[in-house]
Swiss-Prot record:
Domain of life, per lineage: Bacteria
CDD domains from the UniProt entry: Chorismate_synthase
Binding site for FMN: R130, S131, S132, N248, A249, G292, K307, P308, I309, P310, T311, R333
Summary of the function given for this chain in its UniProt record: This reaction introduces a second double bond into the aromatic ring system.
Keywords: Amino-acid biosynthesis, Aromatic amino acid biosynthesis, FAD, Flavoprotein, FMN, Lyase, NADP
Cofactor requirements of the protein: FMNH2
Protein name as catalogued: Chorismate synthase
Subunit and partners: Homotetramer.
Example GO BP: amino acid biosynthetic process
Cofactor note: Reduced FMN (FMNH(2)).
Entry's EC annotation: 4.2.3.5
Length: 384
């Protein structure tokens, strides 16, 4: 399974092509829409979320509600494009724009300057438009389909927020607090911490500042042995790490107890192996459900650190690339905090990697055969 996205933040829309989804998967379009809506929510989002009402237009690969096995083509319209038609048109301009929206003052922390250097763009909007987190809407659409495929195999993927702006939630088992997490404006299981997080976001907004945080993605009911120890690109944790770090503003990733593992003795962090009538399992899950690049059957736990969004309403020092004079960076519309929304995006990219690894292992072209193969494998490892 693989996918590719195209499109700009203020262009006509986002396109995505997904290859490798088996035939016979009945798509719940309402669930796809719920995933798109979840991405647009979360405390701290900016004004654009009031403009865009993301809807997925299927243009191929799904017929009469089920996948055909052909590449799936999706399109998500940018409602805001109506205000940017001339600025973003593909055809050469016939006259000078009244408001060209040229970007020559790169924003620290964004792709603006380095992208301009790499591709030779004197108008850094050509970098901004594609590097924008708007692209993650397409990834959530892909993830929505991947999650439905995994659901057919009994595998679930969800997320919760562990911290925002230095405010940490008390540790709880997120699997026991799903309803609380989904109802929380900041996707936090600790309701007292959630209130403090929202107050911090409000203050950051008043200050023209932004906040980052930490998200955990959890994958439950995984069968063991997905991934491989044989090559670096087939290791499951390697694939997941690459995918989550590719999401805008993500700067660190850990598994299980993450960076805390580096501070402890080996005797306290290895997960002891036990066995009963259900098969092998671990006494603890410090390593986050992956050993040697393969799933162990325990819940996969992925922690991801998101930096504060670099677009500030009180912008930082920059340089105009035309005059070389010092200026404050250009201001673009942005969020004060996108950590809760990022959690939904991270769910999607993790789901895609899990689905891709499962499909690579079982290599079937229809959903029925895939389900049969997974069921047989689960029984095989139970009896091992």
């Amino acid at each position: 399974m693989r996918y590719m996205t195209a499109g700009e933040s203020h262009g006509k829309g986002l396109s995505v092509i997904i290859e490798g989804i088996p035939s016979g998967l009945i798509i719940d379009f309402d669930q796809v829409q719920r995933e798109m809506t979840r991405r647009q929510g979360g405390y701290g989002r900016g004004r654009r979320m009031q403009i865009e009402q993301d809807a997925v237009d299927v243009r191929g690969g799904i017929r009469h509600g089920y996948t055909t096995g052909a590449p799936i083509s999706l399109f998500i319209e940018n409602k805001d494009h109506t205000h940017w038609t001339k600025v973003m048109q593909a055809e050469p301009l016939q006259e000078e724009l009244e408001r060209p929206r040229t970007l020559t003052r790169p924003r620290p922390g964004h792709a603006d300057l380095v992208g301009g250097l790499k591709y030779g763009h004197r108008d850094l909007r050509d970098v901004l438009e594609r590097s924008s987190a708007r692209e993650t809407a397409a990834r959530v659409a892909v993830g929505a389909i991947a999650k439905q495929l995994l659901g057919q195999l009994g595998i679930d993927v969800f997320s919760h927020v562990r911290s925002i702006g230095g405010i940490d939630a008390d540790f709880v088992n997120p699997m026991e607090y799903r309803e609380v997490i989904e109802a929380s404006p900041v996707r936090c299981a600790d309701e007292a911490a959630a209130e403090r997080m929202m107050a911090a976001i409000d203050q950051a907004k008043k200050d023209g500042d932004t906040l980052g945080g930490e998200v955990e993605v959890v994958v439950t009911d995984m069968m063991p042995g997905i991934g491989s120890f044989t090559q670096n690109e087939t290791k499951l944790d390697s694939r997941i790490a690459r995918a989550v770090i590719s999401v805008n503003a993500m700067k660190a990733v850990g598994f299980g107890d993450g960076f805390d593992l580096a501070r402890r003795k080996g005797s306290t962090v290895q997960d002891e192996i036990l066995h009963d009538e259900t098969g092998y399992f671990r006494k603890t899950n410090h390593l986050g459900g992956i050993e040697g690049g393969m799933s162990t059957g325990m819940p996969i736990r992925v922690q991801v650190a998101m930096k504060p969004i670099p677009t500030l309403y009180r912008p930082l020092q920059s340089v105009d690339i035309e005059t070389k004079e010092p200026f404050v960076a250009q201001v673009e519309r942005s969020d004060a905090c996108a950590v809760p929304a990022a959690a939904v995006v991270l769910e999607a990219v993790v789901a895609v990697e899990i689905a891709a690894a499962v499909l690579e292992m079982f290599g079937t072209s229809t959903l029925d055969r895939l389900k049969q193969a997974v069921t047989a494998y689960r029984e095989e490892v139970r009896l091992f």
